[in-house]
């Protein structure tokens, strides 16, 4: 399973998260990447911790490199966590 597949699977298994295809975050100058909306009332730090645990449990390769540079933005009352190293 690739890192992108793992993110998609994890989000699909957890209703408090939602995929954001083609997100362009701060400093990306129009480049697009994969993002995840963490709904209001949920911690984006918990999302990251649990996502990395999910990847470890599923033996996902190259997770460190692909997750490097992950950032977040406010999205109304939600938060979007985005991964510039993962195309969208």
Specify the residue positions occupied by each region the protein language model found.
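Short coil/turn linker and secondary-structure boundary residues
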Residues: 1-2, 42
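Acidic, low-complexity, intrinsically disordered interaction modules
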Residues: 20-88
């Amino acid at each position: 399973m690739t890192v992108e597949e793992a993110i998609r699977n994890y989000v699909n298994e957890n209703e408090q998260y939602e995929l954001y295809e083609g997100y362009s975050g701060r400093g990306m100058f129009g480049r697009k990447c994969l993002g995840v909306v963490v709904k209001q009332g949920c911690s984006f730090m918990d999302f990251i911790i649990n996502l990395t645990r999910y990847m470890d449990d599923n033996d996902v390769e190259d997770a460190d490199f692909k997750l490097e540079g992950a950032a977040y933005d406010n999205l109304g009352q939600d938060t979007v966590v985005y991964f510039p190293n993962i195309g969208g």
